A protein has these predicted regions:
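Internal maturation/activation junctions in enzymes
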Residues: 304-412, 421, 545
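Sec-dependent signal peptide recognition
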Residues: 2-11
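C-terminal motif of bacterial Sec signal peptides marking the signal peptidase cleavage site
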Residues: 14-15
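Noncatalytic scaffold domains of N-terminal-nucleophile
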Residues: 21-50, 54, 62-229, 234-236, ...
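Extended C-terminal subregions enriched in glycine
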Residues: 403, 453-455, 488, 497-546
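Short, small/polar residue-rich loop motifs at catalytic or cofactor-binding pockets
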Residues: 268, 391-394, 458-460
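Active-site rim segments in enzyme catalytic domains, especially the processed small/beta chain
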Residues: 75-82, 86-101, 254-257, 405-469, ...
């Protein structure tokens, strides 16, 4: 058995109203004929951005371009996401002002049990759990694609999948980031042993090299069937049976069945919006962690001392994270299964009070009690604690089309290469390890406990920000597991308060404050100075030589569209000038 994967992976990864609203939010109607800023796409791989631009040049909607880009990402960046996983898509329709949140999160099989990752009273080792069949949830990406396309798409359904089909058939050059993973994964995981995965990533027993031409006819065939026959070709029949067979295989087989796969439905969830100064942060509701963006921004404002010192602002940002993460970890889960006090958590009166519960720098923050604060009716006794870790096998893309419609989309297979199990040309997710793993059947259960048909909590936080007039201002999002709320909040605060450009906010050192310690990315200026100042203030600082963000953001300025791709990955920005 190959062990110690998680630590090695981290080492490699371094190389509106604040209350919940009905399913849609509406911004003031935009002047479509007045949109003269062109179009833009940014994502984690040039092939994906090229696919998005190709679709936009054909008159496609931002949703069409997002589907095309992500279908390509599943091919060229399989370590991060794909059609064997799921995602969240936040859509802004400029003509109507509507915001729509499409939830393609994976769901637990009907045979899932609350203690399925417990063995003899102990939690199954994370690496074993991660690569097990138990970890596979029903993939939601394809169903989310179709739901979003049916509602927003302009081009025919087969057209949006054609770039990925063409690239899988003709082949593409293996990127350095993908190639760099493979020797380490061979040494410390089962990727080089898993049927299908081994033959694809290690032809002849040797890992693919950067620059190798790689074709995936299985993937092309799967997408061709979905394009021609509809998503039933994925969720019923041979492809679904292949997914179930892979999930039920040894070692540590799972219970996922073809019937579970056939039963999958995407969800259309509420969009939540909250104020930051005179602007509005709009984001995805649970099971995502988008609400943490609203919480961090509000808490940051309350914690500011009035000082112009950037060091004081960073300290306020750290404390805002610490409080928001504690509440997120306690209360967020699947809203279909758990009564999440989201309105209370985002209530301005609660957030104002919560900011007064500032913890000593060396202390571990505990969750607040919004029900007690607002009504004298405690929320704290509802759930057990949960400190679930999430690995960083995720991707994000941001797109604006020529009409000013926008998409912020984050997608994942959870850990790098998911479970490393292969079916029909793609890797299968390990999303079930996003649930609370350590659970007693006899004790109070976390909000994020496993249950049949339940969607695990996610840190993914696709967000769209509007200015004081309700005009589109910013699109942001990132991969990064539990660090996603911190990564995304950095760009929001960086652009809207620290005066940074899109690229400056992305390039700025990442600062993550979940729990007792504060991680600071010291290999990026001024990371070391930030770490030194926080240490002097008494914080328990972990200095990190790199973080695994993959921020792809767009800021709308008077001059045009300011896009940024995270240099920590392989992304680019491309624009189409206005007519």
């Amino acid at each position: 058995m190959k062990r110690n994967l998680l630590g090695s992976l981290f080492a490699l990864l371094m190389a509106c109203s604040p209350a919940q609203q009905p399913a849609d939010q509406t911004q003031p109607q935009a002047d479509i004929e007045g949109w003269n800023k062109g179009a833009i796409a940014t994502a984690a791989n040039p092939h994906a951005v090229d696919a998005a631009i190709e679709i936009l040049q054909k008159g496609g909607h931002a949703v069409d371009a997002a589907i095309a880009a992500h279908a390509v990402l599943g091919l060229v960046e399989p370590q991060s996401s794909g059609i064997g996983g799921g995602g969240f898509m936040l859509v802004y329709e400029s003509e109507s002002g509507n915001l729509v949140f499409h939830d393609g999160r994976e769901v637990a099989p009907s045979g899932a049990t609350v203690d399925m990752f417990m063995v003899d009273g102990e939690v199954l080792g994370f690496v074993d759990a991660w690569q097990s069949g138990k970890a596979i949830g029903v993939p939601g990406a394809i169903a989310m694609y179709k739901a979003a396309h049916d509602e927003h798409g302009h081009l025919p359904w087969p057209d949006v999948l054609e770039p990925a089909i063409r690239l899988a058939t003709e082949g593409f050059e293996v990127s350095p980031r993908l190639a760099n993973y493979l020797p380490m994964m061979a040494a410390q995981s089962r990727l080089d042993e898993a049927p299908g995965s081994a033959e694809y990533f290690y032809p002849g027993g040797n890992p693919l090299q950067a620059g190798d031409l790689l074709k995936n006819p299985e993937y092309a065939n799967t997408l061709t069937r979905v394009a021609n026959e509809g998503i039933e070709a994925f969720y019923r029949g041979e492809i679904a049976e292949a997914i179930a067979e892979a999930a039920q295989a040894e070692p540590n087989p799972g219970s996922l069945t073809a019937e579970d796969i056939a039963a999958y439905k995407p969800a259309r969830r509420p969009v939540i919006c909250g104020p930051f100064r005179d602007m509005s942060i709009c984001t995805s509701s649970p099971p995502s962690s988008g609400g943490a963006q609203i919480m961090i921004a509000a808490l940051y404002d309350h914690l500011l001392t009035g000082s112009d010192s950037q060091a004081d602002k960073v300290a306020a940002f750290v404390d805002a994270q610490r409080l928001a993460y504690a509440d997120r970890d306690e209360y967020f889960g699947d809203p279909d299964e758990v009564d999440i006090p989201l309105d209370d958590l985002l209530n301005p009166d609660y957030l104002r009070y919560r900011a007064t519960e500032r913890f000593e720098p060396g202390a571990t923050p505990t969750p607040g009690d919004p029900g007690q604060v607002l009504r004298g009716d405690s929320s704290a006794a509802l759930f057990g604690s949960d400190t679930t870790e999430e690995a960083a096998g995720t991707t994000h893309l941001s797109i604006i089309d020529g009409d000013g419609n926008a998409v912020s989309m984050t997608a994942t297979v959870e850990a790098p290469f998911g479970t490393q199990r292969w079916a029909a040309g793609f890797l299968l997710n390990n999303e079930m390890t996003d649930f609370a793993l350590e659970v007693s059947v006899d004790e109070e259960r976390p909000a994020n406990a496993v249950a049949p048909g339940r969607r695990p909590r996610s840190s993914m936080s696709p967000s769209i920000i509007f200015d004081s007039k309700g005009d589109l201002l910013m699109i942001t999002g990132s991969p990064g597991g539990n660090s996603i709320p911190a990564y995304v909040a950095k760009t929001i605060v960086g652009v809207l308060d620290w005066g940074m450009s899109a690229q400056e906010s992305v390039d700025h050192p990442n600062i993550i404050a979940r729990g007792e310690s504060v991680r600071v990315e010291v290999n990026v200026e001024p990371g070391q100075a930030i770490a030194d100042d926080l240490k002097a203030r008494g914080y328990n600082v972990q200095e990190r030589n790199g973080e695994n963000s993959g921020l792809h953001i767009i800021v709308v300025t008077e001059e045009g569209l300011d896009g940024a791709a995270d240099k920590r990955r392989e992304g680019i920005v491309r624009t189409i000038p206005p007519n």
